[in-house]
């Protein structure tokens, strides 16, 4: 059984026992988290939401909080001796999917 959930402005296809990286959640490591915005549930029978499936949820456990690799941007204007170098590390949360309730 699999589901498509919406979290952090993104849609993710998840299955039970799978680890997924989502946008940062304010939850401590080891705590349970529930995703209520389930857009689609597939498997033996499919359920399509409009926009969400009523009564469906996905439960998971937070494994890790961290930051992704650094992304460097460089802005440059020719002949003006003007340049800017900046970096950014996007925070993420790693979640182990425990169950899909549909």
Curated annotation (Swiss-Prot):
Disulfide bonds: none annotated. GO terms for molecular function: rRNA binding; structural constituent of ribosome. Transmembrane segments: none annotated. It holds the Pfam family Ribosomal_L21p. The keyword Ribosomal protein applies. GO terms for biological process: translation. Keywords: Ribonucleoprotein, Ribosomal protein, RNA-binding, rRNA-binding. The keyword RNA-binding applies. Coiled coil: none annotated. One of its GO terms (cellular component) is cytoplasm. It comes from the Bacteria. This protein binds to 23S rRNA in the presence of protein L20. Part of the 50S ribosomal subunit. Contacts protein L20. Belongs to the bacterial ribosomal protein bL21 family. This is Large ribosomal subunit protein bL21. It comes from Pediococcus pentosaceus (strain ATCC 25745 / CCUG 21536 / LMG 10740 / 183-1w).
């Amino acid at each position: 059984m699999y589901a498509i959930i919406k979290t952090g402005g993104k849609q993710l296809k998840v299955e039970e026992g799978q680890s997924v990286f989502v946008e940062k959640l304010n939850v401590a490591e080891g705590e349970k988290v529930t995703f209520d915005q389930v857009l689609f549930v597939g498997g033996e029978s499919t359920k399509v939401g409009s926009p969400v499936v009523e009564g469906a949820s996905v439960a998971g456990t937070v494994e890790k909080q961290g930051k992704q690799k650094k992304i460097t941007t460089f802005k440059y204007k020719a002949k003006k001796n003007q340049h800017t170098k900046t970096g950014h590390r996007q925070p993420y949360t790693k979640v182990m999917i425990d169950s899909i309730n549909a």
